[in-house]
């Protein structure tokens, strides 16, 4: 029997005879998957024996029958196979299917890279999402290079990396998987000899065997600083080199000078952000000490990068003084260099670079960061990154002035851009805390200062009056003679540490303070008073940090425009906004609004909130910057970034956008340099498209807005009716999903729930969505849509489905909503979900709730296909359709095994091997779905 773990069933992988190019590409992808499947099969057979390999094949084939036909005999056969397996064999089976999911993902990613390269080398027309396409569109609209350069002077595109409480990837496995990817890439790019081809396969086998021998799961729980270190690895993989390169490429495309050089340097607009190490909301482990450690780790990463680049630059700039004249500034840099080697006496550029290296190494040493290589001598530290940039600029100017501009456009160009984008802090670290914590902290401080009053008893108007008075007052609110609670001491310590960080790394190190669960004006004023207390607001009213409200629930989204209208009318607060350049950032939360009101209503209320905020900010003459808290899954606002950005209301982007890149998708988007570069380009192109080109389009038709409001109300009623108003739903959820078992995984530093209750209201949105994904229902990404459409069509027989079809064709927002739902429903499986429903011990409850879910699922699929004019899910997305067909024969068995293990875990005494098996299935299913929560 062949040792190939590979789908061969024609119903699993049909060809597309209507598209020869697609078939050719599909064949190459299948060949890669076949290669990796064969190597994995050989590994399983060699390491675990033929019996285990044969068992893997039996489970896979039976699972395919069950998936295709909901075959009841196949279901019984599958259950019998799983019942007979030992605990140790179960773990081996799970690892085999999990690793195939990982390897199939690698093959798929490499195929996507291959297609990007093929399009580029063949001179194909640029795709939507590529900068070339957007720039061509701008030219068609009469927008020239000069106008575009002006646009980027005030533009901001900021991907913000977050940790993820259900991120299941280990760096050890990621490193080996990247090795596999590199070897596949080598087979594609290089013309290998027969010996080299054999050697390549041998290296692949070595990597796969190493993977098989490597723990998929962590043995210990991550600390926050572990999460920081994991996040920093993506700077090595992608950001430190690709962010500068993207700027250079765009700069060249906008240039008109000889040889393609830009007429003027493009302003840096792409800035990395992070929550990892600064997000305190619900994470008691993020302390002042952790904040300090995070900033030091970030700074160490970027300073070591600069030092490495300077070392290489010094090797390259061997220009002799009698062959290459220099400016006075470079002469002074060379004279100040501690490098006194006679061999470099007549190489002023090398001397200048060695002096810069020495100063940067001294700066790193002061920050207690070891440099990779010792400098040639002692030097004065850099007071700030501006001094470092000025020295690099001096070298650039000298090279350019004396006819060596081509040299300046090499490594030096990228280093100068990196210094401008990353500074000495690498990424802007946001602080985030829940408004309730700020409220308690302020209450304690106020009551200690005014023993006769009770701050928490005040109404909103009274709080606003008191807080604005504090902002006007010069006296401090805290006292060293008062003993405060541990919580208050901790909050003040974090803010003091932020102030200290500004003095060390610059204000860009911590530019935002985000208030989650913002409910009113006082929530922002409380933070302003706390910032004033630690010196982040000075006596003149200058604020050194942006105060950012985060509106998360449906109710808060509906109130956000009124809250900001009242806030911006307060002179004491408006003065703070003016000190920040007249820009106020507002964050919108996709996750909690979805958990609160369902997918349809969440999307619609977010859209309306943006329109309301635009009106308010225009009235007050303040620039609005939106920060989108999108998750990786559609249930938390995920989906294609380009479509999401260009579907924003006209004027909502306005040249500036911040957007979260959630932990569970960072790996797939940024672990590969080419893929990462493409994703950064997509964000940039979408921001440009939405800002300069979208406002010229007409607003959505009034009838569309009215219909969407009605659909939202109907979907909201259906969703809330199930999740919050159905007796027993909480019990059903906790019994039919892995929510209990998720808490045992060593995959994040933050607890899964805000409080120690089983209430849906207290559960974090991420594990909520993650749990529904694991059982293959994906309920947060579609529930309520089908019944809403059916009810709306029944109420509007004159318009009917044809009207909704027009909405889909003409309105980008509605099209994006349905496209994302199409993706979610395609990954769901009612057949598999029914097996999870069987875990609910109360038979009546099981039939009542799963019966409703099944009916709604079918209604949603039927309504979606009718509106899109499709006959099957993903008909308009053949790439994703193919991806799912490749992966699901290996994903479905993991679900079946997980159900079996959950039943055993919950009905027998605790067994470490069973629990480990459950954890492994969680990892494998997450990999197979390619998003986890």
From Swiss-Prot:
Its cofactor is Mg(2+). Disulfide bonds: none annotated. GO terms for biological process: carbon fixation; oxaloacetate metabolic process; tricarboxylic acid cycle. The active site is at residues 164, 595. One of its GO terms (cellular component) is cytosol. It is an enzyme of class 4 (lyase). Keywords: Carbon dioxide fixation, Lyase, Magnesium. The keyword Lyase applies. This is Phosphoenolpyruvate carboxylase. It catalyses: oxaloacetate + phosphate = phosphoenolpyruvate + hydrogencarbonate. The keyword Lyase applies. NCBIfam families: PRK00009.1. The lineage of its organism: Bacteria, Pseudomonadati, Pseudomonadota, Alphaproteobacteria, Hyphomicrobiales. Belongs to the PEPCase type 1 family. Its EC number is 4.1.1.31. Forms oxaloacetate, a four-carbon dicarboxylic acid source for the tricarboxylic acid cycle. GO terms for molecular function: magnesium ion binding; phosphoenolpyruvate carboxylase activity.
């Amino acid at each position: 029997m062949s040792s190939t773990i590979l789908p061969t069933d024609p119903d699993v992988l049909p060809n597309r005879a209507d598209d020869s190019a697609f078939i050719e590409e599909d064949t190459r992808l299948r060949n890669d998957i076949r290669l990796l499947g064969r190597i994995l099969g050989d590994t399983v057979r060699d390491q675990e024996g033929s019996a285990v390999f044969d068992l893997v094949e039996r489970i896979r084939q039976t699972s395919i029958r069950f998936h295709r036909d909901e075959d009841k005999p196949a279901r019984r056969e599958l259950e019998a196979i799983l019942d007979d397996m030992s605990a140790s064999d179960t773990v081996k089976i799970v690892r085999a299917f999990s690793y195939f999911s990982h390897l199939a993902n690698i093959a798929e990613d490499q195929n996507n890279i291959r297609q990007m390269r093929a399009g580029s080398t063949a001179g194909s027309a640029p795709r939507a999402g590529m900068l070339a396409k957007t720039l061509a569109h701008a030219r068609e609209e009469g927008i020239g290079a000069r106008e575009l350069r002006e646009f980027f002077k005030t533009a901001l595109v900021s991907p913000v990396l977050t940790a993820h409480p259900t991120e299941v990837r280990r760096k050890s496995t990621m490193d080996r998987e990247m090795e596999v990817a590199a070897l596949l890439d080598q087979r594609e790019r290089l013309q290998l000899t027969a010996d080299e081809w054999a050697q390549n396969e041998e290296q692949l086998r070595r990597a796969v065997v190493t993977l098989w021998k490597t723990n998929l799961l962590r043995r210990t729980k991550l600390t926050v600083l572990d999460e920081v270190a994991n996040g920093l690895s993506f700077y090595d993989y992608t950001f430190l080199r690709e962010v500068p390169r993207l700027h250079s490429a765009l700069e060249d495309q906008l240039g008109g000078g000889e040889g393609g050089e830009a007429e003027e340097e493009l302003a840096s607009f792409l800035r990395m952000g992070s929550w990892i190490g600064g997000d305190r909301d619900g994470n008691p482990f993020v302390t002042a000490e952790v904040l300090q450690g995070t900033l030091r780790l970030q700074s160490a990463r970027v300073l070591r990068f600069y030092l490495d680049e300077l070392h290489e630059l010094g090797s390259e700039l061997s220009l002799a003084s009698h062959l290459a004249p220099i400016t006075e500034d470079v002469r002074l840099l060379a004279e100040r260099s501690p490098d006194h080697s006679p061999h470099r006496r007549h190489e002023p550029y090398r001397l200048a670079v060695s002096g810069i290296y020495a100063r940067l190494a001294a700066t790193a040493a002061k920050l207690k960061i070891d440099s990779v290589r010792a400098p040639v001598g002692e030097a004065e530290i850099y007071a700030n990154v501006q001094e470092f940039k000025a020295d690099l600029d001096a070298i650039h100017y000298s090279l350019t002035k004396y006819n060596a501009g081509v040299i300046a456009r090499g490594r030096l160009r990228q280093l100068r851009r990196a210094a401008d984008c990353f500074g000495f802090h690498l990424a802007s670290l946001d602080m985030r805390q829940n408004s309730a914590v700020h409220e308690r902290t302020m209450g304690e401080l106020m009551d200690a200062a005014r023993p006769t009053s009770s701050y928490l008893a005040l109404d909103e108007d009274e709080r606003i009056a008191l807080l604005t008075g504090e902002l006007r007052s010069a006296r401090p609110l805290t006292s060293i003679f008062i003993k405060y609670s541990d919580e208050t001491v901790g909050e003040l310590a974090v803010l003091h540490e932020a102030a200290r960080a500004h003095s060390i790394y610059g204000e860009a190190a911590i530019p935002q303070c985000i208030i989650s669960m913002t409910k009113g004006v006082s929530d922002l004023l409380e933070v302003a008073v706390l910032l004033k207390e630690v010196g982040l607001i000075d006596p003149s009213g200058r604020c050194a940090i942006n105060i950012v409200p985060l509106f998360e629930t449906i109710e808060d989204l509906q109130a956000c425009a009124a809250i900001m209208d009242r806030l911006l009318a307060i002179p004491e607060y408006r003065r703070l906004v003016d000190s920040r350049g007249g820009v106020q950032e507002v964050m919108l939360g996709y996750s909690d609004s979805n958990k609160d009101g369902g997918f349809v209503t969440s999307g619609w209320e977010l859209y309306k909130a943006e329109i309301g905020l635009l009106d308010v900010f225009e009235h007050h003459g303040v620039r609005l910057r939106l920060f989108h808290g999108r998750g990786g899954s559609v249930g938390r606002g995920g989906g294609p970034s380009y479509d999401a950005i260009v579907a924003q209301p006209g004027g909502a982007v306005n040249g500036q956008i911040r957007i979260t890149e959630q932990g569970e998708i960072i790996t797939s988007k940024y672990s590969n340099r080419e893929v990462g570069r493409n994703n950064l380009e997509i964000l940039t192109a979408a921001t440009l498209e939405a800002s300069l080109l979208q406002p010229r389009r007409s607003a959505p038709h009034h009838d569309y807005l009215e219909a969407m409001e009605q659909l939202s109300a109907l979907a909201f009623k259906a969703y809330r009716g199930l999740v919050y108003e159905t007796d027993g739903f909480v019990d059903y959820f906790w019994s039919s999903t892995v929510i209990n078992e998720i808490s045992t995984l060593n995959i994040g530093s933050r607890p899964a729930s805000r409080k120690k209750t089983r209430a849906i209201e207290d559960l974090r949105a991420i594990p909520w969505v993650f749990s529904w994904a694991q059982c293959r229902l994906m309920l947060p990404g579609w529930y309520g849509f089908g019944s809403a459409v059916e009810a709306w069509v029944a109420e509007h027989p004159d318009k009917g489905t044809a009207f909704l079809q027009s909405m889909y064709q003409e309105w980008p927002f509605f099209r994006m909503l349905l496209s994302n739902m199409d993706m979610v429903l395609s990954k769901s499986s009612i057949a598999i979900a029914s097996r999870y429903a069987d875990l609910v011990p109360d038979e009546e409850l099981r039939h009542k709730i799963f019966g409703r879910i099944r009916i709604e699922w079918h209604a949603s699929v039927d309504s979606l296909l009718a509106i899109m004019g499709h006959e099957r899910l993903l008909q308009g997305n053949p790439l994703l359709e193919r991806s799912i067909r490749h992966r699901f024969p290996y994903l479905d068995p993991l679900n079946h095994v997980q159900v079996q293990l959950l039943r055993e875990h919950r009905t027998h005494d605790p067994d470490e091997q069973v629990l480990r098996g459950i954890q492994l299935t969680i990892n494998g299913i997450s990999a197979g779905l390619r998003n986890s929560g």
